[in-house]
Structures are given as structure tokens and as C-alpha cells.
Amino acid sequence: MSELTGRKDGISKGKGGSMHMFSKANRFYGGHGIVGAQVPLGVGIGFAHKYRNEKKISRVYLGDGAMSNGQVFEAFNLASLWELPVLFIIENNKYGMGTSIGRSAAGNELFERATVFGIKGEKVDGMNFFTVSDAAIRARDYINKNSKPYIIEMDTYRFRGHSMSDPGLYRTCLLYTSPSPRDSTL
């Protein structure tokens, strides 16, 4: 909370806010102001883990909107080519900022875009804690056993607009009521 309120005792000394948190001590390398730019950074961290013979997995979180950015595909390629311990996690809430996924991306299964690079993965209900937990365990076990990346697409629900300044008027009332929103695990 100190970081979010701009205090010096925050993990980024109060300068990161909600988008640019960073803590090397906690191995949290934060968000990024450019959509999808954290993905190659996460692959670089995975490379460092492999290079140093560390038994660690780099976790890279990205939204469905980032899945149409070129650097994401470049990162998938290198993660697979170099067999890096990286877990890619897509939060698919059906909107990249204010654009519906149907207007910006061909195909329904975003995780399948990584399969062309030989990355195994799956799509799960991101609103179900147990489903997410089971998928994370499968991913961890696969990465540790095979020394290869894995991808999980989590279908979830966006309860509000993209940010405080986004009233979400591009969504119909039906989208707010169907499917029935549940507590999200993300």
C-alpha cells in the first residue's frame, strides 16, 4: 500500500504507483508502460535462471490485448528455441483496453498462438480458484521436468472499465450481467 500511496517506504520508493512497481529483493520486476513489453523481459529473466543453473521459473503475466503485439511472438520463439523455464499467463477478459477481442484478434484460443513455437499450454476458467491452482501445478511440473516454457490462458471477467477514467460505455448492460460475474482469482 505504501507504493500505491506514493510513500518512500514503498517497494519502488513511492515512484512506481500501480503500473511500475519493482522489487529486486522480492524478485518482482513489475509492470510496464508499453503493452506486452514485459514479455521479452520475462523471457530474459528465464534465460538468466537457466544460465545460472537456478531452479526457478519466470512467470510472465499479460493481457489478451498484448497477444497481438509482435514482441510477444518474438519472446515465445526465443523461450521455446532456448528451452527456457518461463510460464506465460494470459488474463483473457475479452477486452484489450476498450477494444473487444473479437474486433482485434482472429481465433478464439489465444494460448494456441504459442503452440506454433512448440510451447505446450491450456485454457482454464480463470474465475475458479481450484482450476487455476491445478493448472499452475501442472505448468510448474511440466517446466521443471522438461525445461521448456508453458502457457496458460485464463478466461476471466472484467467487472469495470480498463482504468478509473474508463466508464466502460462500449460494453452493453448484458455484458455486465451475463455471464454471471463471480469472484476472480486473478
Task: List each model region and its residues.
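Structural signal for hydrophobic packing residues in well-ordered secondary-structure cores
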Residues: 1-9, 49, 94, 136-147
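Acidic, glycine-rich active-site loops and adjacent beta-strand->loop/helix elements
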Residues: 25, 62-68, 90-96, 127-131, ...
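Cofactor-binding active-site loop characterized by glycine-rich and histidine/acidic residues
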Residues: 1-82, 100-106, 111, 116-118
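Short acidic (Asp/Glu) and glycine-rich catalytic loops that position anionic groups and cofactors
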Residues: 91-92, 113-120, 163-172
